[in-house]
Structures are given as structure tokens and as C-alpha cells.
Amino acid sequence: MTSDDIPGNRADRTATPAASASVSAPASASTSGAVIEAAGVRRRYAGGFEAVAGVSFSVARGELFALLGTNGAGKTSTVELLEGLAAPDAGTVRVLGHDPFRERTAVRPRIGVMLQEGGFPSDLTVTETVRMWAGCTSGARPTGEALELVGLGHRARVRVKQLSGGERRRLDLALALLGRPEVLFLDEPTTGLDAEGRRDTWELVRELRDGGTTVLLTTHYLEEAETLADRLAIMHRGRIVTAGTTAEVTAARPARIRFELPEGVPAARLPLGLRAAAEGHRIEIRTHRLQESLDELLTWARESDVRLLGLDARSASLEEAFLDIAQSASESEKVAA
């Protein structure tokens, strides 16, 4: 999404104030429960293309939920429905108990949106840009506070056109946080940031969540989702193919054990039950019983007096689960065709 996708000015999409000046959600937030809900949601475009095909999920108050997927999976189309930029063709969407499209005035003042690609007047300074948006935001944070939150205080007098790509992303985040949102939508929040900037942003997002802000994150950085998300969902071709905690999503995928055998020790000597795949002396074992398989391997190595070189054993990562899901879904579609 870009700033051009938004009906009206962008400042309408920031949130209303809280009493405090911290990064926490407003004290006036409603009672606990799901604050983002999608049920059987479908979205079609001209020509009949269905970008969102029956998506259902919910996000609890104070939860950080990551929506992941391959390019064209339907993430942006789904998030646009949640942000109230369009109405679903079928199904229901609720944010803070309201239809975000038909009840915009009840929703928009309470949410913040960090776009994937913001649009700023390039000749304004950073401070002038924040003040301009703050002028359209009820009870906005002080400009200096917003800039310090995202690490741009020292760049306050710099013109926007002189900012790096990463600094522009920080400015996007500052604008999204101006109104102390109850619900925060983050679309690729750390694109263009260096490693330090990414970690700083992660820490800020954690503070927001810990303060009660509900966060919906879309990102291509799987490490980011793995680090931040309380729960996540992976989309493919308009559908959610798996959802849960990172541990739940990866648990269904095999762990792996990798090592090298010394010269003169063939892979055929390995215990048959390990089902090892060999490429020269390099061995990979994929297993759903990591502890048992590792114990069996180490017992064999000790009894056979074989040294396992570069031994590495680990559970499936989110990246491996993501790639496995995408590949499996694509293969299923080919078979169905």
C-alpha cells in the first residue's frame, strides 16, 4: 500500500489521545477480548480475481499478530479491509467492535497505520511534517516526543528529502503513533533499516504491545515475526493455510540434524531408523522426534567410535515452515489442476 491508496488525508488514520504521554494504549480502552475480527472474508477485484478467499482470524487486545505470506498471498488486500479502505465482498470485519468501512468515524480515530510506503512533502523538515499531521490528529503527542520515540530527535530540522530510506520508515512510524492508537497496523515497518535500527524498532513495538496496544504486523522478515509475534498466520493464494504460535506452526515440520562423516565412514553405516540423506560426506536427517533421533545418533557414534563433524541439531525455524508451506500449497494446486 502507498499513501495514494487512502481516501482523504492520511492524518485521519492516526489515533486519538490517551491521558499519558507514554507508549501505552489509552486507559479508556474497552474491555478485553478480540479487537480485530475477520470471519469468512472474501475480496474480489475486476475480472473475478479473488484476492481474499474466506479468511477468518481474530486478534486479542494487547496481542501482536503477524500476517505472513508469499507475494500475492492476499495480505495487503486483507489488511486494507481491516483498515477500512474497502468493504469485503463477503464475510464480516470488525475492529474495536465496529465495521471499519461503514463506521469509519468510530474506528479511525482509535487506530494508527504505518504504510509500506509513505508520501511526504519533500521540502518540509521532519518537525514540520509531524506538526502538519499532528494538526489533523486530536490530542496528538508532542512533536518532540513522537520523534524521540522513533529515534529521529536529532534529525528534527532536516528536510524530508535528505532522509535515508530507513529514516523515512521511522518518520512513517512516528506519524502512526501520533494519536496513541489502541490498534496499530504495521506494514513492513523495518524495511530499509539497518540492524541497529531494526532492533530499536522491535524494542519500541514490544513496549507498545506490553502497554496494551494491539498490533497487526505484516513483514517479509520472518525473523521479525518470529521475534515479535504472539501468534501468526501464513496466507497463500488468498487463504490462511496455518495459524498459531511460532512453536505451534513449526511443530508440524520436521527438525533437522546435520553433520559430516569422517573419511572412510560411509553413510550406509548409519542406523537405518534415522533415514539419513547423504551428499558426499554431508548428512542431513529430518525427524519429528528430535531428542530420540539425536540420542540414537550419538549412541551409534560413541559405540562405533565415529566423530561427527560440525554437528548441528535444531527444530524447524519459521522460515523453513514458511517455505515448506508455500511449496506444499503450490504442489497441491498443481495436482488439483
Residue spans of the language-model regions?
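N-terminal compositionally biased, intrinsically disordered segments and leader/signal-like regions
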Residues: 3, 15-17, 32, 71, ...
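Short, charged/small-residue-rich alpha-helical element at the C-terminal edge
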Residues: 255-329, 337
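An acidic, carboxylate-rich microenvironment
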Residues: 90, 106, 128, 248, ...
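ABC-family P-loop ATPase nucleotide-binding domain
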Residues: 1-43, 328-337
